[in-house]
Amino acid sequence: MYPKEEHSAGGISSSVNYLDGAYEYPNPTQTFGTSSPAEPASVGYYPAPPDPHEEHLQTLGGGSSSPLMFAPSSPQLSPYLSHHGGHHTTPHQVSYYLDSSSSTVYRSSVVSSQQAAVGLCEELCSATDRQELYTGSRAAGGFDSGKETRFCAVCSDYASGYHYGVWSCEGCKAFFKRSIQGHNDYVCPATNQCTIDRNRRKSCQACRLRKCYEVGMMKGGIRKDRGGRSVRRERRRSSNEDRDKSSSDQCSRAGVRTTGPQDKRKKRSGGVVSTLCMSPDQVLLLLLGAEPPAVCSRQKHSRPYTEITMMSLLTNMADKELVHMIAWAKKVPGFQDLSLHDQVQLLESSWLEVLMIGLIWRSIHSPGKLIFAQDLILDRSEGECVEGMAEIFDMLLATVARFRSLKLKLEEFVCLKAIILINSGAFSFCSSPVEPLMDNFMVQCMLDNITDALIYCISKSGASLQLQSRRQAQLLLLLSHIRHMSNKGMEHLYRMKCKNRVPLYDLLLEMLDAQRFQSSGKVQRVWSQSEKNPPSTPTTSSSSSNNSPRGGAAAIQSNGACHSHSPDP
């Protein structure tokens, strides 16, 4: 998606070009136009849909969303990256590695916990920062029209600063940072001559990284004296703690009672009057307005499906829906008042459940069918082509039937979906590797508000109080079934990933790895078993054992606040 902004007397109007899906945005303040899809790049090869998260839509920042593909090869070597030959090789597909010890024919299917959290941080920080950066609508973070405008040496977008030795935009800076910090094996699906510009920089990671090196980006091009965001944040935190301690000591000597950090957080949270003091009908209206647009698959698929075809379709849809799920979450009342750490943790803990309840709602009026998209409708028999998928389809269809029998209303659905998001991180355990939420008080207040909105929806039916209470219990009890299906889907998706049966896109991959670090018990045992028994085909999934078990929250703290960027089973 490539938004174009035009300033007029009435404000900012936007026109959007969607290359990979048909979306309808009902928005009273903006008008969107839709252009025709782009033509294929060449006969027999269709470029991967451009990842919309680097554009004006509030989405996650990451690498290319192009599907994984077997990358056998013995082609030309890059002068900037070392090439490793693989057992499976075909012309015009080159594997690039930043680590000479790597050996694989797949794009790396594992990102570190830090990378996953950084990508999600970039998405959650993207909306306001990007608008300020490119439109200059605000003084803070915007370009000064009186100063010289510089452009990114890699993609020719507006440069946000001097990064890694060259002028570059936030997207290319973050991409290069992830590439040199992670263990990424990029493969060009074409001829290593892809055009890298603002509109196509996401289409090929291998060529984008090659161009980064060509224009002079280097790992050593960092100002050592500045440290990083995490270093500066740690300095500020230490300074604040010292100041608070000093002031506390002075007040204690003077006999004045001081307020602790926890009380300060509660006081700050309680001060968010606009969110916490909303009436149930106001919360309900906001949730209805936050609903994401319908998504189309836009992929050519012919029946009967094979295992790889089916998994490719479903993971492609999941990746597209994740982009819109992030934008939806940011519109949930109170969500953006949370710290970035808490936003990331809630999303990483609930993403598959949120996608599943959306699938259930779309399928509620189609008995025996699962409506993954307007142009992707499947039944149970079609899921049998994938090992273990039929069981998940059965559970989904049974849950759809139960919601259908309850005659679920749209207002109730939006409340249940928001409850899934907020309740996913409401409780933490000492044995969990995930750090607890920073502001449990605020999260609990949000949960209470949304629960009140659900009660308000049910009360409008005019039924007796007993029937209203019973319906509320019936709806909330079904959320445990969705959690169970989510765990099953996570096990299945990771098993398919380890077998290289599925092309994992960057955003989906980040969410899957983050969920892995947060999981325990049966899910963790299944993953461990999968890693101990890798398939005979060389893959990069074994490298996941080198990742730290600390997930999104720890990575957020180590990286600090981020700048703009950004399965269904």
From Swiss-Prot:
Residues 152-217 bind DNA. One of its GO terms (molecular function) is zinc ion binding. Signal peptide: none annotated. GO terms for cellular component: chromatin; cytoplasm; nucleus. A zinc finger (NR C4-type) spans 152-172, 188-212. This is Estrogen receptor. Residues 28-65, 223-271, 523-569 are annotated as: Disordered. Residues 28-37, 523-532 have a biased composition (Polar residues). It comes from Danio rerio. Composed of three domains: a modulating N-terminal domain, a DNA-binding domain and a C-terminal ligand-binding domain. Residues 279-515 form the NR LBD domain. It is found in: Nucleus. One of its GO terms (biological process) is cellular response to estrogen stimulus.
